[in-house]
Amino acid sequence: MSYMETYREWCSNPYFSEETRAELEAIRDNEAEIEDRFYRQLEFGTGGLRGVIGAGTNRMNIYTVRQATQGLANYIISQNGQEKGVAIAHDSRIMSPEFAEEAALCLNANGIRAYVFDSLRPTPELSFAVRELGCVSGIVITASHNPREYNGYKVYWEDGAQITPPHDKNILAEVAKVTSFTQVKTMEKEDAVKAGLFVTIGKEIDDRYMEELKKQSIHPEIIKEMAKDIKIVYTPLHGTGNLPVRRVLKELGFENVYVVKEQELPDGNFPTVAYPNPESPKAFELALKLAKEVDADIVLATDPDADRLGVYCKDTKTGEYVTFTGNMSGMLIAEYILREKTATGTMPENPALVETIVTTDMAKAMAASYGVALIEVLTGFKYIGEQIKWFEQNHSHNYVFGLEESYGCLAGTYARDKDACVAVMMLCEVASWCKKHGKTLWDAMIDLYEKYGYYREGLSTMTLKGIDGAAQIQQMMSDMRNNPKKTLGGFEVLAVRDYKEDTRKDLKTGEVTKTGLPASNVLYYELSDNAWCCVRPSGTEPKIKFYYGVKGTSLQDAEEKLEALKKDLVEE
């Protein structure tokens, strides 16, 4: 069927709501818009769905959500998992509660019980709930930090981590088989509730989640002693973090928590930010204004689904607020956990730190200094979650901490996804420890640079939209594979890892070995002088990402090296 035929079908078929048909009638004379909405099926990728909200096959709406859920239901039934049920959560975005309910009712119509949170919750709490309730799967309706026009649908498996092989590919195949809405089952909510298939969850899971968060604290006595002297500014950026973050800080004893009023309440329109992303300085404008008014020590922002944390800290020497990258805040928490667990004799046997291949190399130096194994995985926190499962199955290591450069980390194994709630809690505990020792978080960061080296990292993203853009990205990856550079940013290329081919080629000796990681369209360059860079197309957006890192003799030296590498890699 052509896109125009599909459009006419949606306009005339009573299966679609009057509201949907009216929305489509309004674009009758706009063929470009019709084509964009109907030229393809919204792609169910390895993580799930993500797209602009609206009517059409290439949009996020109740019909595309039902279709994806029918595919998931078919897979669950094929795995004999229907008795275990599915946990469902949603964020503060437009249509999130509706999408969550539609997903639940589709599962219910397939005889699968759904445990649905009574209102918005952080993504990591869903990961926890899947494990706590013994579910076979989980669904989160969120588009993380994307602009307000977007929503999404993420799928988790029974270990509480986002789906990884073989489940991701198998679910994808089942979703692809659902080619018509006549294959999609649904039922009335009233009937589902009566049948015990639609179960509402809330406070009890919140309380258990909170207890797990607090168990990660190493020195609650230091918090009790110092908390009254620490001023914290926090913004949930109109998302799900407000209640759980404030609750865990309050229960631990932090009294001086100032929440940015304009961004406190959930609002899917994100009226104060174009892009609710804690990596973006613009997202911190209101928080930094409040920080200056109250003379805050630290400034924190969580993204709408509260799995990522952005940080600023006051440098008392200059009086200015300094931004921390995800690598920096992750390393501060990691150092604290490794140092204090070692000092208190609570470090488990065979401890392991887990990070993605594009995360800071400071982790390698840190792990070595504490005699801790460092395990590297592909980009995406789901692979860190998967690693925890492997540790438990094989009894090889004990997970201590995991982090990725994109502002996500996890202390503890109660969940299997990055958790900004535990990151806030741990960072505020680190700040308490620092305060007790007459330091700030920035002082602690300088200590890490002096101990391990001045590691700095960067990320540049190139957006290339449409069919032409996809071809360009493919061509760029092909060129880099077939014509590898000998030098980058003044650094010599020592080895090239091609994760698609599972090869690591030493350019000095010509020796080729395996990477040991699953196949992925990623190129990684090991450079001289402890530098590196990595190139990968985004899995969810029309983008190609360039990651790079250096080690300098000072902050200035590191910044200069980083700039040279960025210029050569991205701007040529």
Name every feature range the model reports, one short phrase each.
Residues 5-103, 192-229, 240:
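An N-terminal, well-structured beta->alpha segment
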Residues 292, 296-298, 320-322, 340-536, ...:
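Phosphate-binding and adjacent anionic-ligand microenvironments
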Residues 38-58, 143-146, 232, 236-248, ...:
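Conserved phosphate/anionic-ligand binding catalytic regions in large, soluble enzymes, centered on
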Residues 87-150, 250-311:
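N-terminal small/polar loop signature for handling phosphorylated ligands or for N-terminal nucleophile
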Residues 156-186, 327-350, 355-364, 420:
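Glycine-rich phosphate-binding loop plus the immediately following alpha-helix
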Residues 33-38, 42, 151-285, 291:
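Gly/Ser/Thr-enriched, mixed-charge loops and adjacent short helices
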Residues 99-107, 150-157, 307-327, 363:
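Short Gly/Thr/Asp-enriched flexible loops that form oxyanion-binding sites at enzyme active sites
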